């Protein structure tokens, strides 16, 4: 779906068409001539792709966008890099791709690691916009609502990390004015910069994310934990929506630039947090563990991160599990990243006998 090539390919297609007007008239009774837009997309595949963007790098081992290392494009890996590495919780010893500056809380527009997060989120948004633009997608109200929540989550992360990012809710826009549905604030005939047309402000984005989540909620599945044998396992439900609303409201003061005047939003944050707490989702504790797991000395927290956490009982507290398995979703951005990249002082080092050196991680 190389939508960014529209302006180049469409004129070429028009030129070829004009050169063949002497052909039969039936040859002109065509549908969309833009080869970058599939007139009959695989709805199920596109729906799955919207979820895959949370944990996968791409469809075939390569990233969804141009990058030197596909593993660096994974959303989960980038969320860890920017939520944990700049804090005292973790440090990264690597020096490539700008991660050293992230460790030191030095953020500049040219930082490659920062770009990876931005490009991943915009890539996800493009797939979500595509799905939501299709008439056929609206036939299943539940799945349509799920993707609305996924897109709202993408923009919530953009709001949280970047403040005032580019906002686009259309596909294949020819001009910045056609990139979204909120052009009433711009006067016709007046010249605006690209940033003015596409960056609508943190207050706008806060209100938009809130409205999308509230609009999607009624059509979502009920808040209910599932196991990996259930067909609805891994899907967005009302619990996911409530949790995201609670997080949005909790930090409203920053997003709306009105710290100290947020009692109404704190009350809303509490309301939606209590909805999750009072739902069927529960914390995984000893009473829910199998006798075998107890005999092996595991704690409930341990089982949350096991390969069988979709069937060992731990999924009772997983509001939005990110789906991975060793056969279908391999990569260096998800769980493999945490296994291969993390090390602490109590772990044995791995010796590279050929190089006569030791390595703690990658």
Predicted regions, residues:
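Bacterial N-terminal signal peptides that target proteins for export
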Residues: 2-10
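Bacterial Sec-type N-terminal signal peptides, specifically the leucine/valine-rich hydrophobic h-region
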Residues: 18-21
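Membrane-proximal, proline-rich intrinsically disordered regions
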Residues: 24-77
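Conserved, well-structured interaction surfaces
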Residues: 44-48, 52, 57, 90-165, ...
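Short coil/turn linking the two alpha-helices of tandem helical-hairpin repeats
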Residues: 159-160, 166, 251-261
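Polar, glycine-rich mid-to-C-terminal structural blocks
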Residues: 253-254, 270, 274-362
